[in-house]
Amino acid sequence: MSDSIIVNIETPQSSKRKSQISKRYRVTSEEDRRNLKEKVISARLESLDDDNEQQPIGSRGDEEDNDYNDDENEIVYTTPVNKKRLFIAREKKKNEKKSMNLNFNDVLEKSYLETFPDHVPTYISVQSKPSIFPPRHFCSICGYIGAYTCKQCSSRYCSIKCFNYHNETRCKGSIYT
């Protein structure tokens, strides 16, 4: 707490209370700010260097590897596991892995579409009724709903801005006139 200054603040809502001003707010001159900024940057660089430091491949160094224990006396006792539950869990994992790795092309290959008769719907021959809603028309420039149509090339647009852009760059009818 030696890095901070204690200041007494009086507010109308509360009585006297003590607050601490951090070290960075006490810096008053521009030179002190620059020095403090350099210290912070150098501290960050040193911590990054420490994090990224690696031993060269093949050198073991003088220190022993503390992560590796060669003690055969340490035995870890676990609680007994129901073998039937363990077997069921393994089977579930096998089945999940098999089904999760299939993409659509694999599914089509495994479905043997050529073996089905023509009247049976498959992934390729599936059909649906026409929509009861009218078709949507989208702006050829921005993708919003296009309420207007170009008279020259019958492309859709939604606003005057899109129409101007369409006339400048995309209108096929204006090329021939």
Swiss-Prot record:
SUPFAM superfamilies: HIT/MYND zinc finger-like
Alphabetical UniProt keywords: Metal-binding, Zinc, Zinc-finger
Binding site for Zn(2+) 2: C150, C153, H166, C171
ZnF bounds (HIT-type): 139-171
Cytoplasm is among the record's keywords: no
Acidic residues bias locations: 62-74
Keyword Zinc-finger attached: yes
Gene Ontology, cellular component aspect: Swr1 complex
InterPro entries recorded: Vps71/ZNHIT1, Znf_HIT
GO biological process: chromatin remodeling
Basic and acidic residues bias (residue ranges): 27-41
Stretch list, region Disordered: 1-74
Ranges of compositional bias, category Basic residues: 15-26
Domain of life: Eukaryota
Cited Pfam families: zf-HIT
Name under which the protein is recorded: Zinc finger HIT domain-containing protein 1 homolog
Organism listed in the record: Dictyostelium discoideum (Social amoeba)
Lineage: Eukaryota, Amoebozoa, Evosea, Eumycetozoa, Dictyostelia
